Amino acid sequence: LGSAPITEEAIATPPSAETKLVPVGYGIKK
């Protein structure tokens, strides 16, 4: 995963370049 902190919801998403560029709330916004 990226160097940025991740949320439980973000962990559920497959690791990719996108997850490294989006903010911490990625899982929630998605």
UniProtKB/Swiss-Prot annotation:
List the lineage, top down. Answer: Eukaryota, Viridiplantae, Streptophyta, Embryophyta, Tracheophyta
Coiled-coil region: none
A Gene Ontology molecular-function term? translation elongation factor activity
Q: How does it assemble?
A: EF-1 is composed of 4 subunits: alpha, beta (1B-alpha=beta'), delta (1B-beta), and gamma (1B-gamma).
Its biological purpose: EF-1-beta and EF-1-delta stimulate the exchange of GDP bound to EF-1-alpha to GTP.
Q: Per the similarity annotation, which family is this?
A: Belongs to the EF-1-beta/EF-1-delta family.
User: What keywords are assigned to this protein?
Assistant: Elongation factor, Protein biosynthesis
Protein name (database record): Elongation factor 1-delta
